[in-house]
Amino acid sequence: MKTQRDSPSLGRWSLVLLLLGLVMPLAIVAQVLSYQEAVLRAIDGINQRSSDANLYRLLDLDPRPTMDGDPDTPKPVSFTVKETVCPRTTQKSPEDCDFKEDGLVKRCVGTVILNQARDSFDISCDKDNRRSARLGNFFRKVKEKIGGGLKKVGQKIKDFLGNLVPRTAS
């Protein structure tokens, strides 16, 4: 009488289960997004929710902060997007679109989850005022330098004219 232990099908099933056990962790690891991939997905979501006419594309990604290894923990992100020439209704990827000259720039901050199965993000974007502030600082510095230079020139003219006045002999 044969037992199940002697059955060749039991050996095959054991081998199949062993192989599945080895392959499954690899499948789980493959579902974890990189930091940049998670940000690009978040930008896709931003483009879908946007009421603006054109798509936005990643302009600048801030360095990745140190993170724990848990892909289900929200990770902080900050990046800048810029308006492209592609209308929001296009089927093109934003990466295939050129930036719009003088397009709107937005600063985005929030969190993403790297687990591809959860595909979750919480991002808010505001018009990037840093560029305007930098331009304002530039003009203020130019004004200060010109103003300071004009004062010096004015003082030198005064001194020069003061030396031209004839001196009376006592």
Curated annotation (Swiss-Prot):
One of its GO terms (molecular function) is lipopolysaccharide binding. InterPro entries: Cathelicidin-like, Cathelicidin_CS, Cathlecidin_C, Cystatin_sf. Pfam families: CAP18_C (PF12153), Cathelicidins (PF00666). Proteolytically cleaved by proteinase PRTN3 into antibacterial peptide LL-37. Proteolytically cleaved by cathepsin CTSG and neutrophil elastase ELANE. GO terms for biological process: antimicrobial humoral immune response mediated by antimicrobial peptide; defense response to Gram-negative bacterium; defense response to Gram-positive bacterium; innate immune response; neutrophil activation. Disulfide bonds join C86-C97, C108-C125. Its main location: secreted. Residues 1-30 form the signal peptide. GO terms for cellular component: extracellular space; vesicle. Residues 150-162 are annotated as: Active core. Residues 31-131 form a propeptide. Keywords: Antibiotic, Antimicrobial, Cleavage on pair of basic residues, Disulfide bond, Immunity, Innate immunity, Secreted, Signal. It is found in: Secreted; Vesicle. SUPFAM superfamilies: Cystatin/monellin (SSF54403). It comes from the Eukaryota. Antimicrobial protein that is an integral component of the innate immune system. Binds to bacterial lipopolysaccharides (LPS). Acts via neutrophil N-formyl peptide receptors to enhance the release of CXCL2. Postsecretory processing generates multiple cathelicidin antimicrobial peptides with various lengths which act as a topical antimicrobial defense in sweat on skin. The unprocessed precursor form, cathelicidin antimicrobial peptide, inhibits the growth of Gram-negative E.coli and E.aerogenes with efficiencies comparable to that of the mature peptide LL-37 (in vitro). Belongs to the cathelicidin family. The cathelin-like domain (CLD), which is the propeptide part, does not seem to exhibit auto-inhibitory function, as it does not inhibit the antibacterial activity of antibacterial peptide LL-37. This is Cathelicidin antimicrobial peptide. It comes from Macaca fascicularis.
